Swiss-Prot record:
Protein name: Crossover junction endodeoxyribonuclease RuvC
Lineage: Bacteria, Bacillati, Cyanobacteriota, Cyanophyceae, Synechococcales
Binding site residues for Mg(2+) 2: E67
Organism domain of life: Bacteria
Annotated compartments: Cytoplasm
């Protein structure tokens, strides 16, 4: 089983890919898809589309976990929703099953509290994946937490 966790955004899309082998969680890759702020929005969305397709073609995940987006009154809301739409379209085009989780659900599953701090979530991710160093940048650590939430839901702790 191989899962990709995705933390949506327009400027940065965090991703983390975990494989289960002999009941052990193995971190295969994590990072961010960064889009240039100097580019037009449609070009940034296309960059997410292209780079996510390449990642999926390379790693062939069997399932995906994506953070749910809640509407806040913010100037970036529509851009993030558009980026999330591109992400969901790529996953659907690859016939990858998608599970969605709220930030509170992720924190509760990973760190034991729906109000856990970023550090508490990061520590739990590092413990679960037996990492010596924290994944950088933060968006990739968040994506790993999202993937771990899906694994936990599937009974893989």
């Amino acid at each position: 089983m191989r899962i990709i966790g995705i933390d949506p955004g327009l400027a940065r899309v965090g991703y983390g890919i975990i494989e289960i082998e002999n009941e052990k969680k193995i971190l295969l890759d994590c990072g961010v898809i960064e889009t240039g702020k100097d580019k037009k929005e449609e070009d940034r969305l296309y960059e997410i589309f292209k780079d996510l397709n390449e990642l999926i073609n390379h790693w062939n995940p069997t399932s995906a976990a994506v953070e749910k987006f809640f509407f806040y009154r913010s100037s970036t809301t529509i851009s993030v929703v558009q980026a999330r739409g591109v992400i969901m379209m790529v996953l659907a085009s690859k016939k990858i099953q998608v599970s969605e989780y709220s930030p509170a659900q992720i924190k509760l599953t990973i760190a034991g509290s729906g109000k856990a701090s970023k550090k508490e979530v990061l520590d739990a991710v590092m413990f679960s994946l037996e990492l010596k160093k924290p994944p950088k940048p933060d968006d990739s650590a968040d994506a790993l937490a999202i993937a771990l939430t899906k694994l936990n839901e599937d009974g893989i702790n």
